């Protein structure tokens, strides 16, 4: 039995031979003129030839797959930390939004006019 490398090499050689056979133009038979289908002299001949299967690299997404061996206690701690961070962010944004509103709601202190320089 052949190895995988030899099979791949034979498969590749077969595809190359098939491409060469498809790429050749047939010679005109006797009493038949060569016909040019559209296009001018500047076009490359055989532009619509099927080239066989195109081999593409498969992207590696292993970096996106999470590690399956996670201790549940660590995951619980991460969730608690994340929830705490979200609550802190919500509290800060609420304070920022309410700052402008509360500014007009609070009365002036008793000694405000003693220190206020605006007439």
From Swiss-Prot:
InterPro entries: BEX, TF_A-like/BEX. Residues 8-20 have a biased composition (Low complexity). GO terms for molecular function: alpha-tubulin binding; histone deacetylase binding; metal ion binding; molecular function inhibitor activity. Pfam families: BEX. GO terms for cellular component: cytoplasm; cytosol; microtubule; nucleoplasm; nucleus; spindle pole. GO terms for biological process: chromosome segregation; negative regulation of protein ubiquitination; negative regulation of tubulin deacetylation; regulation of cell migration; regulation of cell population proliferation. Keywords: Cytoplasm, Cytoskeleton, Metal-binding, Nucleus, Ubl conjugation, Zinc. It is found in: Cytoplasm, Cytoskeleton, Spindle pole; Nucleus; Cytoplasm. The keyword Plastid does not apply. Residues 31-119 are annotated as: Interaction with alpha-tubulin. Residues 1-53 are annotated as: Disordered. Belongs to the BEX family. Interacts with alpha-tubulin. Interacts with SIRT2. May play a role in microtubule deacetylation by negatively regulating the SIRT2 deacetylase activity toward alpha-tubulin and thereby participate in the control of cell cycle progression and genomic stability. In absence of reductive stress, acts as a pseudosubstrate for the CRL2(FEM1B) complex: associates with FEM1B via zinc, thereby preventing association between FEM1B and its substrates. This is Protein BEX4.
């Amino acid at each position: 039995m052949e190895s995988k490398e030899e099979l791949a090499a034979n498969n590749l050689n077969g595809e190359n031979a098939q491409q060469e056979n498809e790429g050749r133009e047939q010679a005109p038979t006797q009493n038949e003129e060569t016909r040019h289908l559209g296009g001018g002299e500047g076009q490359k001949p055989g532009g619509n030839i099927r080239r066989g299967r195109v081999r593409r690299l498969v992207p590696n997404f292993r970096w996106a797959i999470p590690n399956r061996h996670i201790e549940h206690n660590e995951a619980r701690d991460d969730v608690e930390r994340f929830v705490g961070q979200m609550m802190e962010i919500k509290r800060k944004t609420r304070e920022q939004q309410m700052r402008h509103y509360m500014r007009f709601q609070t009365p002036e202190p008793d000694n405000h006019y003693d220190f206020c320089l605006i007439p």
